[in-house]
Amino acid sequence: NERYQMAGLAKNVEADTVLVGTSMAANYRSSWIQETFGTSAVRLTIPDGYYSEFDQVMNVLFRTQEPERVIFGLDVNTLIRDESGVTAAMPDYLYNANPLDDIQYLLNKDTLYYSAYTLLSNHWGEGDTIDEGFTWDRNEWWNHISALENYDRPEIAAEELPADAYRDDVAANLAVAERWVTEHPDTEFDFFLPPYSILFWDKVIREGRTEAVFAAIRQAGQTLLQYDNV
């Protein structure tokens, strides 16, 4: 479970370049980042993550180390939504500064079982490496037919959403990212837009959200690019 294990990776894997994002970034291997930037690297992903959850990951990361570069996947879906959908899935006790309450995780019977299983699997050469951990592309076969089979095409909306429909939610999310940038001026932050499927954009167009989504992307660029370390 990424929400449990990202805390440990952020605390214990020293890296000069850190990739943070949703499952859209999960298949970018750390080894690729190492090769590209010539530095040590680690990937920290929270599937369908909210900015409050990414904030917890960042707090742990910067509490234990000061990476040279953070690469953050600026997903459109997560950028434009508010925090109303956040669940209790994030184990707050693993992300706070108190090591004593981590005991409930360390002595959990499932944790002990899977830890022993992982250690034995790695010993036998059958376990996942950190490079492959939490990737999901190895057992999937993608083509246009399977993509269309899983796509429920919406009806065309009667009206377009106003361009500023997401403005306030985007501003609230960007305020979180701005705090990372301003509190860590010696770290370079590279924000990128993960490549969404053409079916995503078809859905956006048919739902009348095109201008609102583009406005959100422009808002992100205008907000973040004003900083020297972005």
Feature roles, as predicted:
Residues 1-14:
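Start-of-domain marker
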Residues 2-5, 50-57, 174:
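N-terminal post-signal-peptidase region of extra-cytosolic proteins
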Residues 14-106:
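Membrane-embedded segments
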Residues 43-48, 162-167, 203-208:
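Second-shell loop/turn segments in exported
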Residues 70, 189-191, 230:
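Hydrophobic/aromatic residues located in beta-strands of well-ordered beta-sheets
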Residues 74, 83, 87-188:
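Secreted/periplasmic serine-hydrolase-like ester/acetyl group-modifying domain
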Residues 181-207:
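Active-site segments of SGNH/GDSL-like serine hydrolases
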Residues 200-230:
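Substrate-gating cap/lid alpha-helix
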